[in-house]
Design a protein with these regions (language model features):
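A short, Lys/Arg-enriched amphipathic alpha-helix from helix-turn-helix/homeodomain DNA-binding modules
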Residues: 1-17, 23-28, 48-66
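Short intrinsically disordered, low-complexity coil segments enriched in acidic
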Residues: 1-7, 97-98, 103-104
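Basic/polar phosphate-binding segments, predominantly the helix-turn-helix DNA-binding elements
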Residues: 16, 20-52, 72-97
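Terminal helix-turn-helix DNA-binding modules in bacterial transcription factors
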Residues: 39-78, 100-118
């Protein structure tokens, strides 16, 4: 069940399907899916879905030049403000702040690597 749920999430996390639909597709009730997620992931099924969205948002912010609006659209959010609130609620940083920190940490890493060469 958990492998099927993981495959469903991976292929459809950007569609924002209701948890009930994931449960139906895996052949269990929402309650049972939540119990399994708590057992295997130590969090609810909804949190597993949200963590996947956040992971992809972080990847896009760090490794692409997509605007925050483009990332929101790519991840299935119809409103960039809602995406920003969602991201901040899960990371404690706005998407812009996260991108800035990640860009600065890359610069620091590159500088440190250059210093090691000399």
């Amino acid at each position: 069940v958990m492998r099927l749920f993981a495959r469903q999430i991976e292929s459809q996390y950007r569609e924002h399907l209701p948890l009930k639909e994931y449960a139906r597709r895996t052949g269990v009730s929402v309650t049972h899916l939540n119990q399994l997620c708590r057992e295997f992931h130590n969090c609810s099924a909804l949190m597993v879905l949200h963590e996947r969205l956040i992971l992809e948002a972080k990847r896009c912010l760090q490794y692409t030049q997509m605007t925050i609006s483009q990332i929101a659209d790519y991840l299935g959010f119809s409103d960039v403000a809602y995406f920003s609130r969602f991201f901040k609620r899960h990371t404690l940083l706005s998407p812009k702040a996260y991108r800035g920190i990640m860009n600065n940490s890359d610069d620091i890493s590159e500088t440190n690597n250059l210093i090691k060469l000399f």
